[in-house]
């Protein structure tokens, strides 16, 4: 079961400072609370499967009745002479978050041809991740070994925190300036922006339980473009941009509390050029593009069959280089006032350029299937020349509107 509630509240403000100057702002709050359910510990399977060999076994199902019967008659005198200890339970993986933000833009009409815009974007977010006991499946308590503050195990009941419990914060501040110039057959556009992002992390299941803060990371972006109308039917356009993207928190503060010494921004340089043609009954747009990604970071889940979900291992890839090139064409025609035909084709070649460094992160388990920690192994991954996956590089579309 997945469950989540995410309310959003906006306060909008608009002000005309003069005939040429306008200010628009939005102050917002976004909350969130929810998660998903699953098993935790050693839950019985039918037919029974020993240890962690279930992922390579023949088909099986959860034996809920067998697990409830086992937990209902499992007195462990080391912890209680009367209550039953559950060996497998149901858990909730929960996520709670609060985000506050402000976006404000000032528009100024310099002349009939030139418009300028200046803006800021501020937001701060706090996120809590944890797991909690959802159902003891017939038992009275469960013994969890994930908290370093309880090395001999912590007795937990319904609603108690298990497995992991951490809080993160993200503080973002950005500003930009952009301009648009339009006269006769020529339209020019340009923008520049700067931003900073700062992360913090606190692991409540560590002995120190301290807040770990990373230094602010700064990024920039610059974009420009032009369009020229040759006549009433044909126009040419070109765009170019340089964008820096700060790394995600997993590549800045690691799960063990270590802070990366000098995390690199992802960056890319992108350019495109194309032509538009439009007549009374027919329109077509064609463009070619080239994007060079530098120092890209990717996080990949690995299905190894280890753990309770089968995909708990993660690879953090850093320093990825990619080259994206392609051709895109969109066309439409109005065959009749009641019939419109649309078509599109996209032909791309997206490949990795060079190999990448990666950290392979996997859970550690005890004999009862409880998560007791994490281990990380460094690898070099051979990516050079491979196609970029999870993204369609050749696509066709055809549609009709009647």
Regions found by a protein language model. Name each.
Residues 6-10, 22, 37-42, 47-104, ...:
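Surface-exposed extracellular loop regions of Gram-negative outer-membrane beta-barrel proteins
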Residues 89, 115-231, 248, 253, ...:
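Signature of Gram-negative outer-membrane beta-barrel scaffolds
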Residues 1, 6, 82-91, 156-163, ...:
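Extracytoplasmic loops and strand-loop junctions of Gram-negative outer membrane beta-barrel proteins
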Residues 44-81, 130-161, 256-262, 299-316, ...:
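Surface-exposed loop/turn segments flanking beta-strands in extracellular/periplasmic regions
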Residues 20-28, 229, 235-241, 264-327, ...:
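Membrane-embedded beta-barrel scaffold of Gram-negative outer-membrane proteins
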């Amino acid at each position: 079961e997945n469950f989540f509630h995410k309310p959003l509240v906006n306060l909008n403000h608009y002000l005309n400072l003069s005939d040429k100057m306008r200010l628009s702002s939005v102050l917002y709050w976004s909350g969130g609370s929810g998660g998903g359910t699953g098993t935790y510990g050693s839950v019985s399977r039918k037919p029974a499967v020993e240890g962690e060999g279930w992922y390579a076994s023949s088909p099986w199902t959860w034996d809920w009745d067998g697990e409830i019967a086992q937990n209902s008659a499992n007195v462990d005198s080391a912890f209680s002479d009367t209550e039953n200890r559950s060996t497998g339970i149901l858990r909730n993986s929960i996520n709670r978050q609060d985000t506050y933000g402000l976006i404000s833009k000032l528009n100024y009409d310099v002349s009939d041809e030139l418009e300028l815009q200046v803006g800021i974007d501020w937001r701060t977010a706090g996120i809590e991740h944890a797991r909690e006991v959802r159902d003891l499946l017939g038992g009275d308590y469960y013994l969890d070994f994930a908290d370093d503050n309880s090395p001999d195990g912590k007795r937990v009941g319904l609603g108690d925190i298990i497995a992991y419990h951490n809080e993160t914060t993200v503080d973002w501040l950005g500003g930009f300036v952009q301009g648009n110039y339009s006269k006769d057959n020529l339209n020019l556009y340009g923008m520049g922006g700067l931003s900073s992002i700062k992360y913090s992390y606190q692991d409540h299941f560590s002995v120190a339980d301290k807040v770990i803060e990373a230094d602010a990371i700064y990024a920039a972006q610059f974009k420009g473009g032009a369009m020229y109308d040759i006549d009433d039917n044909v126009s040419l356009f070109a765009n170019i941009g340089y964008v820096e993207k700060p790394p995600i928190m997993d590549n800045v503060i690691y799960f063990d509390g270590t802070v990366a010494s000098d995390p690199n921004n992802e960056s890319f340089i992108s350019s495109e050029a194309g032509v538009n043609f439009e007549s009374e009954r027919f329109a077509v747009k064609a463009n070619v593009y080239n994007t060079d990604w530098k120092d890209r970071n990717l996080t990949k889940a690995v299905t190894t069959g280890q753990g309770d979900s089968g995909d708990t291992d993660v690879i953090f890839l850093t320093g990825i280089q990619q080259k994206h090139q392609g051709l895109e064409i969109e066309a439409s025609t109005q065959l009749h006032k009641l019939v419109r035909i649309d078509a599109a084709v996209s032909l791309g070649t997206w490949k990795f350029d060079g190999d990448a460094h990666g950290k392979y992160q996997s859970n550690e388990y005890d004999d009862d299937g409880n998560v007791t920690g994490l281990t990380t192994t460094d690898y070099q991954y051979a990516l050079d020349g491979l196609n970029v996956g999870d993204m369609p590089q050749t696509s066709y579309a055809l549609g009709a509107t009647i």
